[in-house]
Amino acid sequence: MHALSGFSLVSLLSLGYLSWDWAKPGLVADGPAEAGDQPSVAPPQPPHIIFILTDDQGYHDVGYHGSDIETPTLDRLAAEGVKLENYYIQPICTPSRSQLLTGRYQIHTGLQHSIIRPRQPNCLPLDQVTLPQKLQEAGYSTHMVGKWHLGFYRKECLPTRRGFDTFLGSLTGNVDYYTYDNCDGPGVCGFDLHEGESVAWGLSGQYSTMLYAQRASHILASHNPQNPLFLYVAFQAVHTPLQSPREYLYRYRTMGNVARRKYAAMVTCMDEAVRNITWALKRYGFYNNSVIIFSSDNGGQTFSGGSNWPLRGRKGTYWEGGVRGLGFVHSPLLKKKRRTSRALVHITDWYPTLVGLAGGTTSAADGLDGYDVWPAISEGRASPRTEILHNIDPLYNHARHGSLEGGFGIWNTAVQAAIRVGEWKLLTGDPGYGDWIPPQTLASFPGSWWNLERMASIRQAVWLFNISADPYEREDLAGQRPDVVRTLLARLADYNRTAIPVRYPAANPRAHPDFNGGAWGPWASEEEEEEEEEEEEGRARSFSRGRRKKKCKICKLRSFFRKLNTRLMSHRI
């Protein structure tokens, strides 16, 4: 009977049925006693690495930043680890994920503009070695659960071809939390939940946050803790659509704003998912030799319930509210714990940092923009990073008041760009909505709360802030310090000389899920990609007349979707 009970416990937890019902409070913190700043014993083997990425979680949307949302697990893990309070990410989904997995700025991946959309023949550059591939070389088993959003038009772009041994999740940017349907425009809808390289139709109906936590627990239950593990959990939460199990909504029933109420429920559900994963790390013998990294992917979307207060701006902008990240590291291996770090850290830094922890090596030949920041995080040393290129987007160059003359002949200030050098931050072009938006606690009815966010009256194309002294970006010093402006513009120009061309192809009608059994998935071969590139470069006339006739319908559809993509979908993130 006891043997049967033990079997049932493990089986149910592996399947996720038991993992959502905690018998004891505070299990997340149950572990070996921590000795404050005392050095930890060096691990006997490379550490297990658990990287947890959330989607659209705002700077203010965690308890330890004073939020009205309950996140007891995140609060406790952060308090016992190292809070990263000078940590930067990118303002939208694909760029952050690409920089995490390549260690390179967007200008060095060709993904400078917007996101990768479901019908675009685009993906993470296939000639760049990814973080999981590096970890595989170091002897790690690598697993991904959750949102990919780095392209899938060819099978070579899929997570299982880019370094992950297993994958369960969605390939596109946002799906329904229960049905896993995603629409990329009117009538262009398909199912998007995949296991490995197959469509996971049978898992539909399970709330994604719970499903992903259950799969993470199952991976831990079935893996030998003597072998190093990299587990990348990229939650869909708390990206729209705003959907939550009813029991979490009930906790926030007194919150007046409907969007904020749903958003808060989703955050708390995600917090409990992290608790379950942490418990599984302890239950199956991983915790004592593990490093848990928690990160948001971009700022919160304020008109969808998120909050970046007191920072300026929101998701999709280069103000601090768009690029300042939630982040912490929790690990028994930290030499100095229970503290806040203000060392400058960027999402590209995780690549060399984690490869170093794994016992691997990186070199200048890898072309990385990240730094190994483990000594800064674990020991409290100074960060090797002194600057961050937030981005240069040459396709977004429509700022009416920008010009080359306005940039001292050094830089065209109509181009959207942002850079941080030391304590200075410079923005050019149109950085996006720039208001300071308090948490949306007002009751929601048409025309009320979202009008709190207004587009600033932009009559300039250059902003300069001392971000150390003015983290809320309230005092523009561009007029007072033209010397600093000139220096940072020159630095932008230096970076731009190393940039590769932007890759942002038009939508391909062959990507329609109707051509793939109703699901989103790869549609192109290598030969077809070359053909597409030739057409985009204006060399389609070299094809035979017979071939053009054969593909007449496809050509017309492709032309139509190009227009649809550029006119209607270009701002859908």
From Swiss-Prot:
Instruction: Name the segments for region: Disordered.
Output: 515-550
Cofactor: how bound: Binds 1 Ca(2+) ion per subunit.
Q: Which UniProt keywords apply?
A: Calcium, Endoplasmic reticulum, Glycoprotein, Hydrolase, Metal-binding, Secreted, Signal
Recorded hits in InterPro entries, A to Z, give: Alkaline_phosphatase_core_sf, ARSB, Sulfatase_CS, Sulfatase_N
Annotated residues for binding of substrate: 147, 239, 315
> What role does this protein play?
Displays arylsulfatase activity at neutral pH, when co-expressed with SUMF1; arylsulfatase activity is measured in the secretion medium of retinal cell line, but no activity is recorded when measured in cell extracts.
What is the protein's given name?
Arylsulfatase I
